[in-house]
């Protein structure tokens, strides 16, 4: 159990680096690590993939990078500013029978959601193993 002073100090430190989410159960920390601690690498990997796909479709490397970065930044900003859940935002930018719908159908056919779930699960299991390895309770 942490004291109020300890909690306030932790909040000041962590808020300087980004978002702070308190969890009630200590065993949830492995999931937090899998989503938030490892999450930036997932986003960077998506940006890499978008860049590579853009270049494969004929864009120059600098164009591909700028578009991939701006797309991820803009979508993140919109999601942060909106009270709508991400699924609703996705629906709002997807025209039936359009280009986005075609891309999302490809993601779905390739098991995109399940792939992300497996990756996060693998990270959580590794976080747990590292905790045991390094003496966490």
Annotate each PLM feature.
Residues 1-31, 44-81, 126, 130:
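Internal alpha-helical scaffold of NAD(P)-dependent oxidoreductase catalytic cores
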Residues 28-34, 86-91:
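Short pre-catalytic strand/loop immediately N-terminal to key active-site residues, enriched for Gly-Thr
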Residues 39:
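Aromatic-residue-lined binding/catalytic grooves and analogous aromatic/hydrophobic interfacial grooves
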Residues 43-44, 94:
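Short, contiguous hydrophobic alpha-helices characteristic of membrane insertion segments
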Residues 69-137:
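NAD(P)-dependent Rossmann-like dehydrogenase/reductase catalytic/cofactor-binding core
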């Amino acid at each position: 159990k942490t004291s109020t002073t300890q909690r306030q100090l932790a909040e000041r430190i962590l808020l300087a680096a980004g978002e702070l989410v308190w969890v009630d159960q200590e065993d949830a920390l492995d999931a937090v690590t899998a989503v938030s601690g490892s999450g930036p690498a997932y986003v960077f990997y998506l940006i890499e993939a978008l860049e590579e796909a853009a270049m494969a479709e004929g864009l120059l490397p600098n164009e591909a990078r700028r578009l991939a970065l701006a797309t991820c930044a803009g979508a993140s900003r919109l999601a942060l500013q909106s009270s709508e859940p991400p699924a609703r935002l996705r629906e709002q930018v997807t025209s039936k029978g359009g280009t986005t719908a075609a891309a999302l159908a490809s993601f779905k056919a390739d098991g995109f959601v399940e792939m992300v779930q497996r990756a996060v699960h693998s990270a959580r299991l590794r976080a747990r193993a590292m905790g045991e390895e390094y003496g966490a309770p």
